[in-house]
Protein backbone atom coordinates (compact mmCIF):
# COMPACT_ATOMS: atom_id res chain seq x y z
CA UNK A 1 0.00 0.00 0.00
CA UNK A 2 1.49 3.32 -1.13
CA UNK A 3 -0.05 6.67 -0.21
CA UNK A 4 -0.92 9.37 -2.71
CA UNK A 5 1.74 11.67 -4.15
CA UNK A 6 4.57 9.39 -3.00
CA UNK A 7 7.53 9.21 -5.38
CA UNK A 8 10.35 6.68 -5.62
CA UNK A 9 13.56 6.69 -7.61
CA UNK A 10 14.98 3.70 -9.44
CA UNK A 11 15.72 0.39 -7.74
CA UNK A 12 13.62 0.93 -4.61
CA UNK A 13 12.75 -2.43 -3.06
CA UNK A 14 9.71 -2.81 -0.83
CA UNK A 15 8.97 -6.10 0.89
CA UNK A 16 5.46 -7.43 1.33
CA UNK A 17 2.73 -5.91 3.48
CA UNK A 18 4.60 -2.63 3.97
CA UNK A 19 2.41 0.46 4.22
CA UNK A 20 3.83 3.74 2.96
CA UNK A 21 2.17 7.06 3.73
CA UNK A 22 1.35 9.99 1.48
CA UNK A 23 3.82 12.58 0.19
CA UNK A 24 6.91 10.40 0.78
CA UNK A 25 10.07 10.60 -1.32
CA UNK A 26 12.58 7.74 -1.62
CA UNK A 27 15.99 8.08 -3.26
CA UNK A 28 17.47 5.38 -5.46
CA UNK A 29 18.25 1.92 -4.11
CA UNK A 30 16.28 2.32 -0.88
CA UNK A 31 15.43 -1.05 0.67
CA UNK A 32 12.42 -1.48 2.94
CA UNK A 33 11.76 -4.54 5.10
CA UNK A 34 8.37 -6.21 5.12
CA UNK A 35 5.42 -5.77 7.45
CA UNK A 36 6.27 -2.22 8.55
CA UNK A 37 4.69 1.23 8.29
CA UNK A 38 6.28 4.42 7.03
CA UNK A 39 4.46 7.62 7.96
CA UNK A 40 3.41 10.51 5.75
CA UNK A 41 6.04 12.96 4.50
CA UNK A 42 9.00 10.65 5.09
CA UNK A 43 12.03 11.42 2.95
CA UNK A 44 14.62 8.65 2.62
CA UNK A 45 18.04 9.31 1.11
CA UNK A 46 19.56 7.03 -1.50
CA UNK A 47 20.69 3.56 -0.41
CA UNK A 48 18.88 3.76 2.93
CA UNK A 49 17.89 0.46 4.50
CA UNK A 50 14.72 0.50 6.58
CA UNK A 51 14.36 -2.43 9.03
CA UNK A 52 11.41 -1.10 11.06
CA UNK A 53 8.58 1.40 11.35
CA UNK A 54 9.21 5.10 10.74
CA UNK A 55 7.04 7.93 12.01
CA UNK A 56 6.16 10.61 9.49
CA UNK A 57 7.55 14.10 8.88
CA UNK A 58 11.19 13.01 8.87
CA UNK A 59 14.18 13.17 6.56
CA UNK A 60 16.45 10.16 7.06
CA UNK A 61 19.40 8.47 5.38
CA UNK A 62 21.56 5.41 5.97
CA UNK A 63 21.21 1.92 7.40
CA UNK A 64 19.60 2.07 9.85
CA UNK A 65 18.05 5.38 8.82
CA UNK A 66 19.17 8.40 10.85
CA UNK A 67 19.02 12.17 10.62
CA UNK A 68 21.23 13.50 7.82
CA UNK A 69 23.54 15.47 10.14
CA UNK A 70 24.35 12.34 12.18
CA UNK A 71 24.73 10.24 9.02
CA UNK A 72 27.21 12.55 7.32
CA UNK A 73 29.19 12.97 10.53
CA UNK A 74 29.42 9.19 10.94
CA UNK A 75 30.53 8.82 7.32
CA UNK A 76 33.32 11.34 7.86
CA UNK A 77 34.45 9.44 10.97
CA UNK A 78 34.16 6.08 9.19
CA UNK A 79 36.74 7.13 6.62
CA UNK A 80 39.18 7.91 9.42
CA UNK A 81 38.63 4.65 11.37
CA UNK A 82 41.91 2.97 10.34
CA UNK A 83 43.92 5.96 11.62
CA UNK A 84 41.80 6.26 14.76
CA UNK A 85 42.28 2.54 15.44
CA UNK A 86 46.04 2.87 15.07
CA UNK A 87 46.12 5.88 17.43
CA UNK A 88 44.01 4.03 19.99
CA UNK A 89 46.37 1.05 19.96
CA UNK A 90 49.36 3.34 20.42
CA UNK A 91 47.66 5.09 23.34
CA UNK A 92 46.83 1.74 24.97
CA UNK A 93 50.47 0.69 24.71
CA UNK A 94 51.59 3.99 26.23
CA UNK A 95 49.13 3.64 29.11
CA UNK A 96 50.34 0.09 29.80
CA UNK A 97 53.96 1.27 29.78
CA UNK A 98 53.12 4.06 32.22
CA UNK A 99 51.29 1.60 34.50
CA UNK A 100 54.34 -0.66 34.53
CA UNK A 101 56.58 2.21 35.67
CA UNK A 102 54.91 2.29 39.09
Per-segment meaning from a language model:
Residues 66-102:
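Long, leucine- and charge-enriched amphipathic alpha-helices
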Residues 1-67:
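Structural signal for interior beta-strand "rungs" in well-ordered beta-sheet cores
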Amino acid sequence: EVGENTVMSAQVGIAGSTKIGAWCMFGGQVGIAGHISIGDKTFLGAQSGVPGNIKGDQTLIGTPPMEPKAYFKSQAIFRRLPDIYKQLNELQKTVEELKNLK
